[in-house]
Amino acid sequence: MSCCNPCVPCQPCGPTPLANSCNEPCVRQCQNSTVVIEPSPVVVTLPGPILSSFPQNTVVGSSTSAAVGSILSCEGVPINSGGFDLSCITSRYCGNRCRPC
């Protein structure tokens, strides 16, 4: 009959290290994370349009002056709205003196 001893696990040679360490960098790639950030409600007040009116006291087709508070004139000669000669205005740009309307 033979006698067989079970194998004894290998033991390190020399003293047992107090800590295991290595010089290889440890890099681990993790999965991407998805984060949904919902903004809080913000109240924005936009200014409304500014409505202003400029009343004009003109009457179309009347014999009163077309300009309120002033008299239209061509080189000092008054122009009435009750029909006037256009040559008075056009001659001003041609270098001629205005003739009375």
Swiss-Prot record:
Single GO molecular function: structural constituent of cytoskeleton
Modified residues (N-acetylserine): S2
Protein name in the entry: Feather keratin Cos1-1/Cos1-3/Cos2-1
The entry's keywords: Acetylation, Keratin
Alphabetized Pfam families for the sequence: Keratin (PF02422)
Family, as annotated: Belongs to the avian keratin family.
GO terms for cellular component: intermediate filament
Species whose genome carries this gene: Columba livia
Entry keyword Repressor: no
Subunit architecture: The avian keratins (F-ker, S-ker, C-ker and B-ker) are a complex mixture of very similar polypeptides.
